[in-house]
């Protein structure tokens, strides 16, 4: 089924909405813990694609990359007022202010540009409350719902007894922002290459990106893996994570998706690359398998169990007949600062690497049926490894006008209702050429 994605870098009080569970056929009985469950089934990624996945290890490519590159952008931090920040300086309108001016019939009151918005972060600089009262509908909604409104709204939002405190930004963490919206927009939409002027208002490239990211604040997506919601991840005596939502994405699932989507299809997908409570969504760009070696069952046990003499056979998947040890380097796209130029020509400057180490579990025919992460669990000659990603997801597009239950049964929009995807899409189309009217 489809998940409605609002994941982060985001306020952790807002939960993922999904009609999927890890239980089969509505049963309350979980799958065996030693196999990937429905939440980790790679087939979830191809339900809406005319494609079939390959599972035989020998048929899977050792390297691959996305043919359509995801573009870097700011994650528009909450503490900076999200996409209402005046990123070019206080004498230039924010992306939301520009949109209101062109599309929402907003007219700035006299002296508006002399009003000072609140600065980002913990600042003692003065600001003008009248600025926020004068905002147009898109900018005001963004500031109040995705920005730093709680730092100057006269309320004790983090319930610590202090109103509008500077320290801690009234409970706003620095990682909160729109990377959950940037990631699908960057994967699915073409990067704007030129500024676009409408009715005398010029939308710079990062203005355009901010608008498109705003429309992807809630996305349609297929998700693999559960959300880990704790910073205190407990492990057993062998270093294996106990909580299934923190242990997945299953290593076998990860390898199947990585090699099929990037290796065979050239399609980017998204990951939460940190398995703790923080959510850092990133587009996955490419991979290369550094080491792939079929190993014996006893070798697999030795890699996974501190005292191999305590087990008589492989303990994590009773159907596994063959095993492989894998080391893979994965490149992902990172955020950028807002800028007035495209990044298409220096895309590699915004790639970072993770190295993963895992065991693949296979049936007798060599088809992958599961896996176990080794990252940090064993002393290895392969060097340093990253911890496994939390979940993977395949974006399908922005969700139109999602609503949530508000106070007294009211229906509240979950993303900015004053920004139109079709209007922003038209701006993006114009931004592909300097000559389009």
Language-model region placement:
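Sec-dependent signal peptide recognition
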Residues: 1-2
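C-terminal motif of bacterial Sec signal peptides marking the signal peptidase cleavage site
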Residues: 5-8
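Bacterial lipoprotein signal-peptidase II cleavage site
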Residues: 10-16
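Active-site-adjacent structural elements in enzyme catalytic domains
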Residues: 17-154, 159-437
């Amino acid at each position: 089924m489809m998940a409605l994605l609002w994941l982060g870098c985001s306020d952790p009080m807002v939960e993922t909405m999904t009609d999927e569970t890890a239980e089969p056929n509505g049963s309350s009985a979980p799958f065996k813990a030693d196999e990937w469950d429905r939440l980790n089934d790679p087939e979830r990624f191809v339900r809406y694609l005319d494609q079939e996945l390959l599972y035989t290890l020998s048929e899977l490519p050792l390297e691959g990359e996305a043919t359509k590159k995801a573009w870097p952008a700011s994650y528009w931090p909450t503490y900076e007022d999200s996409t209402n920040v005046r990123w070019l300086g206080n004498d230039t309108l924010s992306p939301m202010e520009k949109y209101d001016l062109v599309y929402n019939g907003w007219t700035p009151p006299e002296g508006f540009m002399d009003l000072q918005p609140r600065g980002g972060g913990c600042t003692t600089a003065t600001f003008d409350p009248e600025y926020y009262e004068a905002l147009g509908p898109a900018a005001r909604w963004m500031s109040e719902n995705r920005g730093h409104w709680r730092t100057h709204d006269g309320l004790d939002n983090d319930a610590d007894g202090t109103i509008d405190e500077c320290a801690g930004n009234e409970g706003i963490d620095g990682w909160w922002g729109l990377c959950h919206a940037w990631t699908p927009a960057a994967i699915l939409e073409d990067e704007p290459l030129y500024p676009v002027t409408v009715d005398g208002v010029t939308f710079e490239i990062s203005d355009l990106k901010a608008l498109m990211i705003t429309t992807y604040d809630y996305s349609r997506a297929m998700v693999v893996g559960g959300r880990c919601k704790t910073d205190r991840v407990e492990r057993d005596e062998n270093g294996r994570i106990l909580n299934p939502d923190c242990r997945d994405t299953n290593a076998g699932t990860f390898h199947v998706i990585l090699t099929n989507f990037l290796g065979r299809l050239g399609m980017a997908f998204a990951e939460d690359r940190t398995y703790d409570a923080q959510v850092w969504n990133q587009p996955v760009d490419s991979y290369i398998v550094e080491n792939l070696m079929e190993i014996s069952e006893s070798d697999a046990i030795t890699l996974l169990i501190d005292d191999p003499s305590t087990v008589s056979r492989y303990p994590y998947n009773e159907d596994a007949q063959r095993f492989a040890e894998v080391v893979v380097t994965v490149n992902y796209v990172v955020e950028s600062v807002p800028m007035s130029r495209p990044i298409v020509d220096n895309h590699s400057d915004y790639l970072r690497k993770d190295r993963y180490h895992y065991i693949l579990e296979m049936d007798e025919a060599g088809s992958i049926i599961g896996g176990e992460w080794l990252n940090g669990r064993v002393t290895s000659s392969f060097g340093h490894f990253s911890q496994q990603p939390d979940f993977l997801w395949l974006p399908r597009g922005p969700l139109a006008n999602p609503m949530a239950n508000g106070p007294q049964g009211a229906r509240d929009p979950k993303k900015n209702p004053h920004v139109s995807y079709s209007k922003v899409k038209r701006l993006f189309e114009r931004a592909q050429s300097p000559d389009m009217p």
